[in-house]
Amino acid sequence: MEQYDLPESEYLDKAPLQWTEAQHSDLIHRVEDAAQLADISVLSDLRHGTGFFDASRNVIHIREGNNSTEQLKSLLEGYSEAVITRTSTSDKPVAELESAALTALLQVRCGVPIDDQLAERITAALEDAGNVGGFSMRDSVARLHNAMEYCVRYAELEQTSEQYQAQQIEPEELTPQSEAFMEMM
């Protein structure tokens, strides 16, 4: 299997931001809007388990979480599966690998930690995909890159993160009284 090593500068500059509960709620709405733009319904279930995409009904099922981070995680799982299901031309084990990997990328991008369950899902999917004749990691990475660009564009994750990052870095605008006080100093 092919190995890809990136220089540190390739991934350290794109470290995930730390998101708050309110920001996760905003991301939930953005991802739901992106799904609706693609004519995919989102249905909340009172059950345990991961989010998933029901292709026959064109519905993403997400679990109700104890907080918005859990809900976002479930939604990203279902949304990733929907994107890969709609765009993948590969065998089912390869599509499962790409779906799990896209889920991980979106979670990292949104500041949601990767849990052991997702890590195990990726490991098992990689083993299964490796058994598919003609499996190419290079092709999967290329499809994953395109899927991530699609998700970022339609869910506006990049724009959202830049806005939050700018809010965290840029000071608030000074009032005329504050400016006058600063000039006196």
Task: Give short role names for the model-derived ranges.
Residues 1-177, 182:
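N-terminal accessory/interface modules of nucleic-acid-binding and processing proteins
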